[in-house]
């Protein structure tokens, strides 16, 4: 009976011939599929994504995504929120990362993003090796607003336990105590570290201050405390690790060393026996010389080896150093060195290699700018023309470089060669240009170099200041001597005599003046010894009675429960009424309505018979004043306010409420008045310059609108009083008080006699003023008008002949006067000064 084979066995037998076939033959029979080219993204190629964190429309939270620390062949996720911070709805186009290690996932519920809401994006990171990863998410909004969200992934130290405070206490003087800080790495990547001291101390030593933490290994940092004196010492260190987006670790070490700390009994006895004094003769004492221990030589730091523009570290035993050498390119600077070169301002001190790096960076920047412009499909307008300032700076830079090149080459400097006083030998060949003109040097002789007039003038000025200071000091000393030599008894005696005369009823001023004339002594007061009382201090009463009213002292009294209400009187507020103060009378409105009459009549009044009215012609009276032979055109009258006093406001003398309003003094000869040109007191700086055809000066407004300040008018505040300058220390000297306020030093002895009547000059002036107030008119004279209007002096010869003619008629004289008035008004600057 045959055994039926199972289907699995049949499949296994069928696969056997295929397994025995060569794989190369199978690959040759199968055609490889063609890789399709990726479709270019229009938003990725036509937009520039440079803004971080946020733009005008959206905001990324967080702005930069970090994957700090990861595990290979595992997935890590982080959340990114994109919020709408604008006032309108917006549409978003999120471009995913370009590498396969980062993937994004988000759920877009609506087609637009409402203001205030956010879109949640999940970022998944899948690493395959230990290295640094970088990518970004690009977001395009409505319009041309873009946003860039960078993504960083990097290995970190996971098991780093760095303390923040360590206390090394109770350390003996001369001994040491150490503390070891382990730096452990859990990933197969080397990390560099270095330690900086924020606060240092001599008693602490740290080894090593820099090094490498090996991959999946451990490095130790030892902090040793060796006190050199009693007290407390403290340092603060900072640990930096060469990993991306790392923060420094800080730690504070404190060490103490106190005297007389607890010692063992045997050590205490040993120190006690050594401290006992032993009486040994001086000649038997031995001199022991203590040599200091040789200082430990610090190991020299191995320098890097430069070979064919490559730098090889001295220690190549770790993979970090090997990777550093393999990643180098000949002639390429590091990022740190390139930043230092770009930060320097003076390009003369840079080497040729640094200048080439800067030039290559500028070319690279121009290429990137052209690429961005090509993506924008815009016409490149080119650069601006070279400015004059840039040309001048470039020329000065070339001159400096040429001067430095000549200095390094050893060329002689012309200015220094002309000032050289001795001959110098040079081994260098000097080449001169025969075509150029030789500069001739002509010496100059100055005979006024040795003139000592300025020094002599300065010494004389200082001598004058010193002499003035000595004179003031001597004058002050004489005044102080006179004050100290006052006779106080005579002063008091004269005071008593004057008081006695006042009691008798005499005139104090006449009696005092007569008394001063009789006696030669200058003091006017006196005091007798009987009137001086002794000093008395308050003393307690000897007889103290306990039963007296005040024997028990203050006795507390219970306050009454009755509440007393205080009445506050209120006074009526009285406001000053101006119409009563100025003398105005009240006006009745009712009477004005009944007594008011219109200026124009409603209808014309009736007249009598016009035919019966006889016309009466009145002959005008002729003026009986005889006319002079020479006609006068000076018929103007001065204004009436010239001889009148200024009118004051009634509130100017007594103002009951000055806080409400203030009445100022009226301006005399204000500029708004017509008689301002007759001002007798100028309010401005007078100069000889004036207008053409007038005597009014040009500077009449400088006083009213001046902004300058008289220099030196407040210099007296800078000087110290003479009394304080003569003393050594004004704060330590007691201030003296004046004993006599009416001494002859301050007040004169001979005073003028009292006046019984006005002096003769004042009396004549008052009489003249009274005459002016009576209404006497002041007439202008031809001399006054000639001074004010100098153009009237120059007259035509023809007009002079007409004035000399005495046969003119009165009508022609009036016409001449009117013509002269018109001519005068046309030539004057202020036409309103000439009256009709």
Curated annotation (Swiss-Prot):
Q: Which tissues express it?
A: Expressed in testis, specifically in developing spermatocytes and spermatids but not in immature spermatogonia. Expressed in the ciliated respiratory epithelial cells lining the sinuses, trachea and bronchi (at protein level).
Cellular component terms, GO, for this chain's entry?
A: 9+2 motile cilium; axoneme; cytoplasm; extracellular region; glial cell projection; manchette; sperm flagellum
Briefly state the protein's biological role: May play a role in cilium morphogenesis.
UniProt cross-references to Pfam families, sorted A to Z: HYDIN_VesB_CFA65-like_Ig (PF22544), Ig_CFAP65_4th (PF24507)
Q: Which domain of life is it from?
A: Eukaryota
Q: How does it assemble?
A: Interacts with calmodulin; calcium-dependent.
Q: When this gene is knocked out, what is seen?
A: Mice lacking Pcdp1 have several phenotypes associated with primary ciliary diskinesia, including hydrocephalus, male infertility and respiratory abnormalities. Hydrocephalus is observed on the B6 background but not on the 129 background. Male infertility is observed on both backgrounds and is due to an absence of mature spermatozoa in the seminiferous tubules.
Any one GO MF annotation of this record = calmodulin binding
Organism, scientific name? Mus musculus (Mouse)
- Report the Gene3D superfamilies cross-referenced here: Immunoglobulins
Region (Interaction with calmodulin) location: 466-500
Q: Does the keyword tRNA processing apply?
A: no
Spans traversing the lipid bilayer: none
Q: Where can this protein be found?
A: Cytoplasm, Cytoskeleton, Cilium axoneme; Cytoplasm; Cytoplasm, Cytoskeleton
Task: Kindly state which keywords UniProt assigns to this record, in alphabetical order.
Answer: Calmodulin-binding, Cell projection, Cilium, Cilium biogenesis/degradation, Cytoplasm, Cytoskeleton
The GO annotation for biological process reads: cerebrospinal fluid circulation; establishment of localization in cell; mucociliary clearance; sperm flagellum assembly
**Name of this protein:** Cilia- and flagella-associated protein 221
Chief location: cytoplasm
- Of which family is this protein a member? Belongs to the PCDP1 family.
């Amino acid at each position: 009976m045959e055994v039926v084979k199972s289907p699995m066995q049949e499949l296994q037998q069928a696969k056997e011939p295929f397994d025995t076939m060569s794989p190369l033959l199978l690959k040759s029979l199968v055609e490889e599929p063609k890789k399709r080219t990726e479709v270019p993204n229009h938003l990725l190629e036509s937009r520039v994504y440079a803004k971080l964190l946020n733009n005008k429309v959206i905001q990324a939270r967080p702005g930069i995504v970090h994957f700090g620390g990861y595990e290979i062949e595992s997935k890590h996720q982080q959340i990114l929120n994109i919020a709408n911070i604008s006032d309108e709805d917006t549409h978003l186009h999120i471009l995913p990362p370009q590498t396969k290690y980062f993937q994004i996932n988000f759920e877009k519920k609506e087609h637009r993003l409402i203001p205030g809401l956010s879109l949640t994006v999940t970022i998944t990171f899948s690493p395959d090796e230990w290295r640094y990863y970088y990518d970004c998410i690009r977001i395009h909004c409505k319009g041309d607003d873009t946003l860039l969200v960078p993504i960083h992934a990097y290995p970190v130290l996971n098991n780093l336990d760095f303390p923040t405070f360590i206390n090394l206490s109770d350390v003996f003087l001369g001994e040491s105590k150490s503390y070891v800080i382990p730096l452990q790495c859990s990933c197969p990547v080397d990390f560099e570290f270095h330690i900086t001291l924020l606060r240092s101390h001599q008693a602490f030593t740290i080894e090593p201050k820099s090094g490498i933490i090996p991959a999946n290994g451990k490095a130790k940092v030892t902090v040793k405390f060796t006190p050199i004196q009693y007290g407390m010492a403290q340092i603060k260190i900072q640990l930096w690790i060469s990993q991306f987006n790392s923060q420094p670790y800080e730690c504070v070490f404190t060490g103490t060393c106190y005297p007389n700390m607890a010692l063992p009994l045997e050590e205490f006895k040993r120190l006690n026996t050594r401290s006992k004094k032993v009486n040994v003769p001086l000649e038997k004492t031995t001199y022991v010389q203590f040599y200091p221990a040789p200082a430990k030589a610090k190991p020299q730091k191995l320098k890097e080896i430069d070979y064919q523009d490559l730098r090889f570290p001295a220690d190549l035993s770790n993979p970090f150093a090997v990777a550093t050498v393999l990643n180098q390119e000949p002639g390429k600077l590091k990022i740190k060195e390139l930043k230092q070169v770009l930060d320097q301002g003076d390009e003369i001190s840079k080497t040729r290699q640094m200048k080439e790096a800067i030039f290559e960076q500028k070319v690279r920047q121009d290429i990137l700018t052209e690429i961005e412009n090509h993506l924008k499909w815009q016409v490149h307008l080119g650069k601006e023309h070279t400015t004059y300032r840039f040309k001048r700076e470039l020329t000065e830079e070339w001159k400096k470089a040429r001067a430095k090149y000549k200095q390094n080459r050893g060329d002689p400097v012309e200015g220094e060669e002309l000032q050289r006083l001795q001959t110098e030998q040079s081994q260098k060949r000097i080449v001169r240009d025969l075509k150029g003109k030789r500069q001739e040097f002509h010496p100059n002789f100055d005979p006024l170099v040795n003139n000592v007039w300025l020094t002599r003038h300065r010494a004389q000025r200082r001598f004058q200041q010193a002499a003035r200071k000595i004179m003031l000091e001597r004058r002050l000393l004489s005044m102080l001597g006179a004050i100290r030599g006052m006779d106080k008894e005579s002063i008091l005696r004269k005071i008593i005599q004057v008081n006695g005369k006042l009691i008798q009823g005499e005139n104090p001023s006449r009696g005092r003046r007569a008394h001063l004339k009789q006696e030669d002594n200058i003091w006017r007061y006196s005091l007798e010894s009987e009137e001086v009382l002794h000093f008395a201090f308050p003393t307690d009463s000897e007889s103290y009675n306990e039963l007296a009213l005040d024997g028990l002292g203050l006795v507390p009294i219970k306050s009454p429960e009755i509440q007393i209400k205080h009445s506050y009187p209120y006074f009526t507020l009285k406001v000053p009424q101006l119409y009563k103060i100025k003398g105005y009378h009240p006006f009745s409105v009712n009477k004005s309505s009944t007594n008011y009459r219109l200026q124009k009549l409603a209808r014309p009044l009736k007249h009598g018979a016009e035919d019966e009215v006889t016309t009466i012609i009145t002959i005008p009276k002729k003026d009986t004043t005889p006319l002079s032979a020479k006609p006068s055109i000076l018929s103007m009258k001065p204004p009436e306010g010239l001889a009148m006093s200024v009118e004051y406001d009634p509130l100017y003398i007594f103002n009951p409420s000055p806080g409400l309003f203030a009445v100022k003094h009226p301006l005399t000869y204000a500029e708004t008045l017509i008689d301002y040109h007759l001002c007798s007191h100028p309010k401005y700086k007078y100069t000889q310059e004036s207008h053409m055809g007038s005597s009014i000066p040009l500077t009449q407004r400088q006083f009213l609108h001046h902004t300058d300040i008289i220099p030196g008018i407040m210099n007296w505040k800078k000087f110290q009083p003479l009394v304080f300058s003569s003393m050594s220390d004004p704060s330590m000297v007691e201030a003296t008080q004046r004993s006599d306020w009416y001494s002859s030093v301050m007040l004169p002895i001979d005073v003028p006699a009292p006046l019984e009547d006005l002096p003769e000059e004042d009396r004549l002036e008052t009489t003249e003023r009274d005459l002016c107030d009576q209404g006497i008119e002041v007439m202008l004279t031809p001399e006054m008008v000639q001074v004010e209007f100098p153009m009237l002096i120059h007259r035509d010869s023809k007009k002079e002949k007409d004035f000399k003619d005495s046969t003119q008629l009165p009508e022609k004289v009036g016409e001449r006067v009117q013509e002269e008035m018109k001519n005068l008004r046309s030539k004057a600057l202020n036409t309103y000064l000439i009256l009709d």
